[in-house]
From Swiss-Prot:
One of its GO terms (biological process) is regulation of DNA-templated transcription. Participates in both the initiation and recycling phases of transcription. In the presence of the delta subunit, RNAP displays an increased specificity of transcription, a decreased affinity for nucleic acids, and an increased efficiency of RNA synthesis because of enhanced recycling. Residues 125-143, 150-200 have a biased composition (Acidic residues). Residues 125-200 are annotated as: Disordered. This is Probable DNA-directed RNA polymerase subunit delta. InterPro entries: Asxl_HARE-HTH (IPR007759), RNAP_delta_N_dom_sf (IPR038087), RpoE (IPR029757). Keywords: DNA-directed RNA polymerase, Nucleotidyltransferase, Transcription, Transferase. GO terms for molecular function: DNA-directed RNA polymerase activity. Residues 19-88 form the HTH HARE-type domain. NCBIfam families: RNAP_delt_lowGC. Belongs to the RpoE family. The gene is rpoE.
């Protein structure tokens, strides 16, 4: 036999079968008051006792109820699956409550060990090369060789690049082209008359 000690005055005169679980949850939390938040399972048990529903009916309704509890703006999760009414807390107070709960969780959690990556395609093949195993960039202590990096602040890098570029140009271009070449800038321009002739 179920205990039905909880009576909610808000629903006096209404058929319990017509009430939604979310309405009953709100009324239960309002009756309990601030500083009496409830764990989800306790809240569900209170709702079940008040409505007098069977275990199978409650189990069937749980996914919808949990979704409504999350999306209904009047409820707030305080961590550890503990629920309260949003109206109990000011905006700043909500952040403080959640942060305090997160800090308590951080104290209890041990640091996780770094996991070694496993290549599923190697299957113990001794001839296979594991390219992930010898990648120096994967190591935390890896530092790039400063001689191989390009530094924007170093003018010697730019000077070396210019000298290398000039050397390449001198290899390609003959030395006697220097001053004898006249560039006719008019030849390089494309006039409107040329455009009309090329289209026809």
């Amino acid at each position: 036999m179920r205990r039905n000690a909880l009576e909610l005055e808000v629903f006096a005169g209404q058929e319990k079968s017509e009430l939604s679980m979310i309405e009953v949850a709100r009324a239960i939390l309002e009756l309990r008051g601030r500083d009496h938040e409830m764990h989800f399972s306790d809240l569900v048990n209170e709702i079940q006792n008040y409505l007098g529903t069977s275990n199978s009916d409650i189990r069937e309704a749980l996914p919808l109820f949990y979704t409504e509890l999350n999306f209904d703006g009047s409820f707030i999760s305080l961590g550890d699956n503990k629920w309260g009414l949003r109206s109990w807390y000011g905006v700043d107070e909500i952040d403080e409550e959640i942060i305090a709960l997160e800090e308590n969780d951080d104290d209890e959690v041990a640091p996780k060990a770094k996991k070694k990556r496993v290549n599923a395609f190697m299957d113990g093949d001794s001839d296979a090369i594991d390219y992930n195993a010898d990648d120096p960039e994967d190591e935390d202590a890896y530092e790039a060789d400063p001689a191989l990096s390009y530094d924007d602040e170093n003018p010697d890098d730019e000077k070396n690049e210019v000298e290398a570029y000039d050397a390449e140009i001198n290899e390609i271009a003959p030395d006697d082209l220097g001053e004898d070449v006249d560039l006719n800038e008019d030849d390089d321009e494309f006039s409107d008359d040329d455009a009309e002739t090329s289209e026809e």
